Amino acid sequence: MNNYQIQPVEISADIISLLSGFYCGVKLMDEILHSQGLLSELHTDNPMAYCVYNEQKLLVGFCIAGQISLPFETDGCYAYVDMVDIVCLAVHKDFQYRGIGTAILDYICKKADIICSGADFIHVDALDLDDGSYSAVPFYQKYGFFYCSRSGEDAARMLYALYQ
Protein backbone atom coordinates (compact mmCIF):
# COMPACT_ATOMS: atom_id res chain seq x y z
CA MET A 1 0.00 0.00 0.00
CA ASN A 2 2.64 2.49 -1.04
CA ASN A 3 1.92 6.20 -1.25
CA TYR A 4 -1.40 6.06 0.60
CA GLN A 5 -2.22 7.90 3.79
CA ILE A 6 -4.86 7.01 6.39
CA GLN A 7 -6.41 9.98 8.16
CA PRO A 8 -8.93 9.92 11.03
CA VAL A 9 -11.90 12.21 10.34
CA GLU A 10 -14.61 13.30 12.79
CA ILE A 11 -18.05 11.94 11.95
CA SER A 12 -20.28 14.75 10.68
CA ALA A 13 -22.73 15.52 7.89
CA ASP A 14 -19.67 16.37 5.75
CA ILE A 15 -18.91 12.64 5.51
CA ILE A 16 -21.83 12.15 3.10
CA SER A 17 -20.49 14.83 0.73
CA LEU A 18 -16.97 13.41 1.09
CA LEU A 19 -18.32 10.04 -0.09
CA SER A 20 -20.35 11.46 -3.01
CA GLY A 21 -17.84 10.34 -5.65
CA PHE A 22 -16.79 7.16 -3.85
CA TYR A 23 -18.02 3.84 -5.25
CA CYS A 24 -16.84 0.40 -4.16
CA GLY A 25 -18.84 -1.38 -6.86
CA VAL A 26 -21.19 -3.30 -4.53
CA LYS A 27 -24.63 -1.77 -5.03
CA LEU A 28 -25.92 -2.23 -1.47
CA MET A 29 -22.72 -0.87 0.11
CA ASP A 30 -22.66 2.11 -2.26
CA GLU A 31 -26.30 2.87 -1.36
CA ILE A 32 -25.42 2.75 2.35
CA LEU A 33 -22.37 4.99 1.90
CA HIS A 34 -24.37 7.62 0.00
CA SER A 35 -27.36 7.57 2.35
CA GLN A 36 -28.14 10.08 5.08
CA GLY A 37 -29.07 6.97 7.09
CA LEU A 38 -25.37 6.13 7.36
CA LEU A 39 -25.06 8.69 10.13
CA SER A 40 -28.45 8.28 11.78
CA GLU A 41 -28.10 4.52 12.14
CA LEU A 42 -24.68 4.36 13.77
CA HIS A 43 -25.16 2.01 16.73
CA THR A 44 -21.66 2.39 18.06
CA ASP A 45 -20.12 4.67 20.66
CA ASN A 46 -17.53 7.27 19.67
CA PRO A 47 -17.59 6.51 15.93
CA MET A 48 -14.73 7.83 13.84
CA ALA A 49 -14.15 7.73 10.09
CA TYR A 50 -10.83 6.62 8.66
CA CYS A 51 -10.15 7.86 5.14
CA VAL A 52 -7.42 6.54 2.86
CA TYR A 53 -6.08 9.00 0.29
CA ASN A 54 -3.65 8.44 -2.57
CA GLU A 55 -0.93 10.86 -3.72
CA GLN A 56 -3.48 12.85 -5.73
CA LYS A 57 -5.61 13.28 -2.56
CA LEU A 58 -8.32 11.02 -4.02
CA LEU A 59 -10.36 9.08 -1.46
CA VAL A 60 -9.57 5.41 -2.19
CA GLY A 61 -10.64 3.70 1.05
CA PHE A 62 -13.07 4.38 3.87
CA CYS A 63 -13.95 2.90 7.23
CA ILE A 64 -16.12 3.83 10.20
CA ALA A 65 -15.19 2.25 13.52
CA GLY A 66 -16.21 2.80 17.11
CA GLN A 67 -16.96 0.96 20.35
CA ILE A 68 -19.77 -1.52 20.97
CA SER A 69 -20.83 -3.81 23.84
CA LEU A 70 -22.15 -7.19 22.77
CA PRO A 71 -23.63 -9.94 24.95
CA PHE A 72 -21.86 -13.29 25.19
CA GLU A 73 -23.00 -16.48 26.85
CA THR A 74 -20.57 -18.74 28.67
CA ASP A 75 -21.78 -21.70 30.72
CA GLY A 76 -25.28 -20.25 30.94
CA CYS A 77 -24.07 -16.83 32.12
CA TYR A 78 -24.34 -13.69 30.03
CA ALA A 79 -21.82 -10.88 30.05
CA TYR A 80 -21.35 -7.80 27.91
CA VAL A 81 -17.97 -7.41 26.26
CA ASP A 82 -16.67 -4.07 24.96
CA MET A 83 -14.99 -4.30 21.58
CA VAL A 84 -14.02 -2.30 18.53
CA ASP A 85 -16.86 -2.24 16.00
CA ILE A 86 -16.17 -1.84 12.29
CA VAL A 87 -19.40 -0.28 11.02
CA CYS A 88 -18.32 -0.27 7.39
CA LEU A 89 -15.14 -0.73 5.39
CA ALA A 90 -14.93 -0.13 1.65
CA VAL A 91 -12.26 0.37 -1.00
CA HIS A 92 -12.94 2.36 -4.17
CA LYS A 93 -13.64 -0.04 -7.05
CA ASP A 94 -10.70 1.31 -9.08
CA PHE A 95 -8.22 0.66 -6.24
CA GLN A 96 -9.22 -2.79 -5.00
CA TYR A 97 -6.74 -5.67 -4.65
CA ARG A 98 -3.88 -3.32 -3.77
CA GLY A 99 -3.75 -4.01 -0.03
CA ILE A 100 -5.81 -0.96 0.99
CA GLY A 101 -8.48 -2.94 2.87
CA THR A 102 -5.80 -4.90 4.71
CA ALA A 103 -3.97 -1.65 5.55
CA ILE A 104 -7.19 -0.26 7.04
CA LEU A 105 -7.53 -3.37 9.22
CA ASP A 106 -3.87 -3.07 10.27
CA TYR A 107 -4.50 0.56 11.23
CA ILE A 108 -7.67 -0.30 13.21
CA CYS A 109 -5.75 -3.06 15.06
CA LYS A 110 -2.95 -0.62 15.96
CA LYS A 111 -5.45 1.98 17.18
CA ALA A 112 -7.81 -0.52 18.87
CA ASP A 113 -6.98 0.56 22.41
CA ILE A 114 -7.66 4.19 21.50
CA ILE A 115 -10.94 3.31 19.78
CA CYS A 116 -12.09 1.08 22.67
CA SER A 117 -9.93 0.98 25.78
CA GLY A 118 -9.26 -2.58 26.91
CA ALA A 119 -10.83 -4.20 23.86
CA ASP A 120 -9.86 -7.80 23.19
CA PHE A 121 -11.86 -8.18 19.98
CA ILE A 122 -12.80 -6.41 16.78
CA HIS A 123 -16.38 -7.01 15.63
CA VAL A 124 -17.76 -6.62 12.11
CA ASP A 125 -21.06 -7.51 10.50
CA ALA A 126 -19.48 -8.36 7.14
CA LEU A 127 -21.60 -7.85 4.04
CA ASP A 128 -22.68 -11.32 2.89
CA LEU A 129 -25.55 -11.17 0.41
CA ASP A 130 -28.03 -14.04 0.56
CA ASP A 131 -28.23 -14.22 -3.24
CA GLY A 132 -24.51 -15.08 -3.35
CA SER A 133 -23.61 -12.08 -5.51
CA TYR A 134 -21.12 -10.69 -2.96
CA SER A 135 -19.48 -11.70 0.29
CA ALA A 136 -16.82 -9.89 2.33
CA VAL A 137 -16.46 -12.96 4.57
CA PRO A 138 -13.40 -14.40 2.72
CA PHE A 139 -11.60 -11.03 3.02
CA TYR A 140 -12.09 -10.96 6.79
CA GLN A 141 -11.30 -14.68 7.20
CA LYS A 142 -8.02 -14.19 5.34
CA TYR A 143 -7.12 -11.51 7.90
CA GLY A 144 -7.95 -13.85 10.80
CA PHE A 145 -11.55 -13.02 11.68
CA PHE A 146 -13.74 -15.97 12.63
CA TYR A 147 -17.38 -16.44 11.72
CA CYS A 148 -19.87 -16.31 14.60
CA SER A 149 -23.38 -16.20 13.13
CA ARG A 150 -25.69 -14.56 10.63
CA SER A 151 -26.55 -10.96 11.44
CA GLY A 152 -29.70 -10.01 9.60
CA GLU A 153 -30.37 -10.84 5.98
CA ASP A 154 -27.21 -9.53 4.41
CA ALA A 155 -24.43 -9.87 6.98
CA ALA A 156 -22.24 -12.35 8.81
CA ARG A 157 -21.17 -11.52 12.37
CA MET A 158 -17.40 -11.98 12.67
CA LEU A 159 -14.80 -11.40 15.40
CA TYR A 160 -11.06 -10.92 15.46
CA ALA A 161 -9.03 -11.61 18.61
CA LEU A 162 -6.59 -8.73 19.04
CA TYR A 163 -4.15 -10.63 21.25
CA GLN A 164 -3.59 -13.97 19.60
Tell me what each language-model feature is.
Residues 1-40:
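Short amphipathic alpha-helix that is part of the acyltransferase structural core
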Residues 60-88:
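Conserved acyl-donor/pantetheine-binding loop and adjacent beta-alpha core of acyl/acetyltransferases
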Residues 87, 92, 127:
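Residue-level recognition of the GNAT/N-acetyltransferase active site
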Residues 91, 97-112:
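Conserved acetyl-CoA-binding loop-helix of GNAT-fold acetyltransferases
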Residues 105, 112-128:
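Conserved GNAT acetyl-CoA-binding A-motif
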Residues 117-119, 128-150:
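Conserved active-site alpha-helix within GNAT-family acetyltransferase domains
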